[in-house]
UniProtKB/Swiss-Prot annotation:
It is an enzyme of class 6 (ligase). It catalyses: tRNA(Ser) + L-serine + ATP = L-seryl-tRNA(Ser) + AMP + diphosphate + H(+); tRNA(Sec) + L-serine + ATP = L-seryl-tRNA(Sec) + AMP + diphosphate + H(+). Its main location: cytoplasm. Keywords: Aminoacyl-tRNA synthetase, ATP-binding, Cytoplasm, Ligase, Nucleotide-binding, Protein biosynthesis. GO terms for cellular component: cytoplasm. Consists of two distinct domains, a catalytic core and a N-terminal extension that is involved in tRNA binding. This is Serine--tRNA ligase.
Length: 431
């Protein structure tokens, strides 16, 4: 969450910056909560001072052998008032915390102001889309003859799932292995294996809760009627990776922390009804290789550009045309201060589609998680956190199928993946 001191010092400026994100800050509610908090805290201090004064009087009266009952009765009454004030203050603090958790991150000054994706700014294009001398097919038609099956998945589970068999399943696995190897061997990340089920504290730490619970899949021990705390399937490995440093104080020389993980991701896709209903572009379950960095605050924007380059390197090695865009204020994710999207060329759609999103969250997540490091003065200071897809495996598979398709229905496997394919250099349609 953002620093509450910013609201206390200049709430109107904060409200104006958030308006660029299409978020209306309820200034009146915050001011009312703060006014009552100050009033109670001031009253509490007065009561405590009065109690201290009376306690001294009791001592003096006892020393003189005089009656202390009236003064002691007043002290007892003050104790009751203090308990009531403390209880009300706890309620207020909870309301203020709830208020703060609902506020998105402040956009960095370099982020273009805009309403939606139409106002995003293209930074660069890399690679030239291939010219085909035959009718281009989409990944659904190509994949149907290669072992990609949505009907069986619908029978097993429902819509927005897929089954892969044979060579295409191996290609999917090869992509994930290639991404992990590149990030660990070339980019300096530590590979991690993390839980695919997390608790509410973890999701609150990275910003999915409480605001976006409808986007999640909830699970319980013992089935739907089971007992115990609410647990959730991860929407991205960003959640468990980033929460590794929750409630930790790192040594300054331990920064940056670079972590990567391959995991399935589970999303309800609330609000996306009717969008991308065909194929693998938008599914309830998909694989992704995630990158996370925990860095010194002064180096987070350097790290953002670095991470964008790491994601780009995967696309370059695969020979896939892509572009990089800077998201405008109105199109950024809840926790991001600045985001670059990488979009890969999909011939069948004749357009670029998102395949990676790389974001600097500054101290937004760290403040929620209390992820800190010891600064040069030895004092705990909030880290900055960054995350990015490196890449979405399913969408990368889609891009490979469409960009490397052949007229006979086969798909040439990018050379960089050959070591992972057991000698296969081309996927052939199954009889």
């Amino acid at each position: 969450m953002i620093d509450i001191q910013l609201l206390r010092k200049d709430i109107e400026t904060v409200a104006a910056r958030l308006a660029g994100r299409k978020f209306q800050l309820d200034v009146n509610t915050f001011n009312a909560l703060e006014a009552e908090r100050k009033q109670i805290q001031s009253g509490t201090e007065e009561l405590q001072n009065r109690r201290n004064t009376l306690s001294k009087q009791i001592g003096a009266l006892k020393g003189k052998g005089e009656d202390t009952s009236a003064v002691m009765a007043e002290v007892a009454g003050i104790g009751d008032e203090l308990k009531a004030s403390a209880a009300r203050l706890d309620v207020l603090q909870a309301e203020i915390s709830k208020f703060m958790l609902a506020i998105p991150n402040l956009p960095h000054e370099s982020v273009p102001v805009g309403k939606d994706e139409e106002d995003n700014v293209e930074l660069r294009k890399v690679g030239t889309p291939r010219a085909f001398d035959f009718e281009v097919r989409d990944h659904v038609d190509i994949g149907a003859a290669l072992g990609l099956d949505f009907d069986v998945a619908a029978k097993i589970t429902g819509s927005r799932f897929s089954v892969m068999k044979g060579g295409i399943a191996r290609l999917h696995r090869a992509l994930a292995q290639f991404m992990l190897d590149t990030h660990t061997e070339e980019h300096g990340y530590t590979e991690c294996y993390t839980p695919y089920i997390v608790n509410a504290d973890s999701l609150q730490g990275t910003g999915q809760l409480p605001k976006f619970e409808a986007d999640l899949f909830a699970v319980k021990k013992g089935g739907q009627e089971g007992e115990g705390e609410a647990l959730y399937l991860i929407p991205t490995a960003e959640v468990p990776l980033t929460n590794i440093v929750r409630d930790e104080i790192l040594a300054a020389d331990a920064l940056p922390v670079r972590m990567t993980a391959h995991s399935p991701c589970f999303r309800s896709e609330a609000g996306s009804y009717g969008r991308d209903t065909r194929g693998m572009i938008r599914q309830h379950q998909f694989d992704k290789v995630e990158m996370v960095q925990v860095v010194h605050p002064e180096k987070s924007y350097e790290a953002l550009d670095e991470m964008c380059g790491h994601a780009e390197n995967i696309l370059k090695k695969l020979g896939l045309p892509y572009r990089v865009i800077t998201l405008c204020t109105g199109d950024m994710g809840f926790g991001a201060s600045k985001t670059y999207d990488l979009e890969v060329w999909l011939p069948a759609q004749n357009t670029y589609r998102e395949i990676s999103s790389v974001s600097n969250c500054e101290a937004f997540q760290a403040r929620r998680m209390q992820a800190r490091f010891r600064n040069a003065q030895g004092k705990p200071e909030l880290t900055h956190t960054l995350n990015g897809s490196g890449l979405a495996v399913g969408r990368t598979l889609v891009a490979v199928l469409e960009n490397y398709q052949q007229a006979d229905g086969s798909v040439i496997i990018p050379e960089v993946l050959h070591p992972y394919m057991g000698g296969l250099t081309r996927l052939l349609p199954q009889a």
